[in-house]
Amino acid sequence: MSFNVRGSFRDARKKNAWRNRADLNVATIGCYAPDVIGLQEAQRGNLGAYHKRLAHYAHIRGPRYGNSIPHDFNTILFDPERLEPLDSGGFWLSETPEKHSRSWQTKVARSATWALLGVLGTDITFLHLNTHLDHVSALARQEGSKLVVRKIAEISGRTDVGPPAIVTGDFNSRPDNRVHKTFTESGFVDSYLAAGNEEGANTFHAFKGALYRDAHPARGPRRIDWILLKDPEGRLRIDSHKIIRDADEDSGLYPSDHYPIMAEFGFQATGFRFQE
């Protein structure tokens, strides 16, 4: 699952404040029970709720991003009964990725979190990287995506197995944008398209749900959240992809201003399946 959860300190005095939608947000994750989750915009209140109410997940918080406190995190959650962390880390999307920094006219400092995960009881491993590209600077999105591709190659090169790589994130870019091409030209496959879906969907909806498109017809579809796979050896099979549009119809609340998305993968050789 990839889920921009909308930070818990945002919208504090509004209907969509975290305190009003936390139950629905947590319940949505619990209902679909993915094995791995890439969170974007996770702040202390969000993570505290997940620690308490989704306690079976282990957390890899990753480096903070943003310009000031409260910081955001691209945290990875995983089910330790199915997966074990073999290595993990993070970096900033900048010309100096080893430290909290900004480059390329980015509005705020941005980061990525990664984890090399092993499937318990098997010799299967895969790399998961989770990120959130800038919402203002097109240059930052382009250069950030290039850096992510390079870092994945670097991390994979340190392993003996050359694992499949899965990237989750809020890319603040439509699929017809240069950012998407940076990934596909580097061998990544968009799980939404690979699962047989057609373009025209939104993943960002500004807490308006299906009404968002009617309110902003000139903007067109905004499928800006993706789950991407690079697996040149064909070890993983993309079985499905869904955009989760759950909402509380009585209150009109949504879990976030983005829909969570989820893909299901199967390993060709073993039949093992997991939900990302």
Where are these regions (language model features)?
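Structured beta-strand-rich core segments of catalytic domains in phosphoester-bond hydrolases
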Residues: 36-129, 133, 240
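Acidic/histidine-rich helix-loop elements
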Residues: 2-23, 93-107, 134, 211
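Metal-dependent phosphoester-hydrolase catalytic domains
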Residues: 82, 139, 153-165, 173-276
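Active-site metal-binding loops of divalent metal-dependent hydrolases
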Residues: 3-5, 131-133, 170-171, 259
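His/acidic metal-ligating clusters that form di-metal
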Residues: 111-129, 138-181
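N-terminal, active-site-proximal structural segment of metallo-dependent hydrolase catalytic domains
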Residues: 1-53, 64-72, 146, 269-276
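Active-site neighborhood of phospho(di)ester-bond hydrolases with catalytic His/Asp-centered motifs
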Residues: 37-40, 62, 166-170, 190-194
